[in-house]
């Protein structure tokens, strides 16, 4: 027997109670999407995305709302991104985002910069630096950074 988290008299934890959806629209250089989950792993998620390309510059935005059905988490957040293709092989990238727990006000912020270098039609190498701050952590670990290097090959 399942649980009735929202007290509507219905089992909210069965395998057939979850739903995912996605709608997207694309026209020329504009891309829009909305996607979400209802009652998947006891969470409801809504995500909206917009992206626009102007010649060598690509701009992006994402908004997300996430609630769990147990009442312990209610988060909302956003991300801005930009990518600029310098020439046929190099793309510079930047991203900034923040997510806030609407229950207790804790906020996490992230900023990333990086670059891709195209080695061939299906292969690129990339590098990035990310800086994160989390107000929920009351210690020296509330700020942390990461550096990444990698290679991607598409078959």
Predicted regions and their residues:
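Outer-membrane beta-barrel proteins
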Residues: 1-155
